[in-house]
Amino acid sequence: MLVLTRDIGETFSIGDDITVQILGVNGNQVRLGISAPKDIKVHRAEVYKRIANKLSQQAAQTQP
């Protein structure tokens, strides 16, 4: 895992198309702004897991 130290307003890039900016820090919370092409889906981990579980359940129901 890459660990970075950034100040508010600073950015880092992921590949050529994704930029992440530190918008703010409040206690234990960090606000991030993510710029990515519309065809790249960006989700929080818990939302991504829910989507993956739902798709898995749908696939299981459609199998003969």
Curated annotation (Swiss-Prot):
What keywords are annotated for this sequence in UniProt? Activator, Cytoplasm, Repressor, RNA-binding, Translation regulation
Q: Which gene encodes it?
A: csrA1
Q: Has the keyword Nuclease been applied to this entry?
A: no
Per the UniProt entry, what are the Gene Ontology biological process annotations, in alphabetical order?
mRNA catabolic process; negative regulation of translational initiation; positive regulation of translational initiation; regulation of carbohydrate metabolic process
State a GO cellular component annotated for this protein.
Answer: cytosol
What's the protein here called? Translational regulator CsrA 1
Please give the Gene Ontology molecular function terms for this protein.
Answer: mRNA 5'-UTR binding
Quaternary structure per UniProt? Homodimer; the beta-strands of each monomer intercalate to form a hydrophobic core, while the alpha-helices form wings that extend away from the core.
Say if the entry is tagged with keyword ATP-binding: no
Question: What InterPro entries does the record tag this protein with?
Answer: CsrA (IPR003751), CsrA_sf (IPR036107)
Subcellular location field = Cytoplasm
Family classification: Belongs to the CsrA/RsmA family.
Q: Which Pfam families match?
A: CsrA (PF02599)
What's the stated role of this polypeptide? A key translational regulator that binds mRNA to regulate translation initiation and/or mRNA stability. Mediates global changes in gene expression, shifting from rapid growth to stress survival by linking envelope stress, the stringent response and the catabolite repression systems. Usually binds in the 5'-UTR; binding at or near the Shine-Dalgarno sequence prevents ribosome-binding, repressing translation, binding elsewhere in the 5'-UTR can activate translation and/or stabilize the mRNA. Its function is antagonized by small RNA(s).
